[in-house]
């Protein structure tokens, strides 16, 4: 489930993170080629966007959305992350996960994992509690307070604000590929108040698939290869547009 409640004051008054300086564009390598096991052709990756941070939502004592037949969101998105990771790695991307097993890192720990990377995008994975089965939706954060105070500093809980435009571009690309795979999915990314995205200083999206209301978990598992392919295609398509904004500093 994507939409989450607003953070408490204690969650917003966090230590500062450093927003990396703008990336220096470089020309694509001429020694590219199609990977033999790749689901689609990929050129050798130049400097810039090379890291994808995958966030399987929930975990530990938080199962996320639950459906009939023992369906638990936290378990399904962890398996989905493995599929997405394999597909991305075939394209030459480095992949970092916020969790590897049944643990539940805090929102801030998950964001810190992404914020520590350079040249990264962030994708948090969810299963809907009420969505249309068989579809997939991308969300970008809509809860964007002013970017900086009068001194040009950004509080931790507003870290996503300078990246909103890039997140929207990235989200629309991924949503377009998901729509090609899953009939009835939206044409473009939607906006929502997504707590996990708010403190992430990188292009960041939430991908929510199908619904836990399906009769059989196998219905969700069958979507995994298509979701993984769509995300990987979206990342590859976004790569030429990737640049780190020349954002202000961050409020301690």
Where are these regions (language model features)?
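Catalytic-site microenvironment of enzymes
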Residues: 1-252
């Amino acid at each position: 489930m994507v939409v989450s409640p607003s953070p408490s004051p204690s969650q917003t008054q966090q230590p500062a993170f450093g927003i990396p300086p703008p990336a220096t564009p470089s020309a694509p390598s001429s020694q590219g080629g199609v990977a033999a096991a790749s689901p689609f052709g990929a050129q050798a990756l130049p400097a810039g966007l090379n890291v994808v941070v995958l966030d399987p939502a929930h975990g530990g004592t938080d199962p996320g959305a639950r459906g009939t037949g023992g369906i638990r969101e936290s378990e399904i998105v962890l398996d989905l992350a493995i599929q997405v990771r394999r597909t991305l790695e075939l394209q030459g991307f480095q992949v970092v996960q916020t969790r590897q097993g049944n643990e539940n890192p805090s929102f801030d720990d998950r964001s810190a994992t992404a914020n520590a990377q350079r040249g990264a995008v962030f994708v948090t994975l969810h299963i809907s509690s009420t969505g249309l089965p068989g579809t997939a939706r991308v969300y970008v954060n809509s809860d964007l307070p002013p970017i900086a105070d009068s001194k040009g500093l950004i509080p931790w809980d507003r870290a996503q604000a300078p990246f909103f435009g890039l997140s929207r571009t990235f989200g629309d690309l991924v949503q377009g590929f998901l729509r090609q795979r899953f009939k009835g999915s939206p044409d473009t990314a939607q906006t929502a108040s997504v707590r996990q995205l708010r403190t992430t200083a990188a292009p960041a999206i939430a991908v929510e698939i199908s619904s836990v209301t399906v009769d059989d978990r196998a219905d969700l598992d069958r979507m995994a290869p298509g979701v993984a392919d769509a995300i990987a295609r979206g990342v590859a398509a976004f790569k030429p547009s990737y640049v780190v904004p020349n954002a202000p500093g961050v409020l301690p």
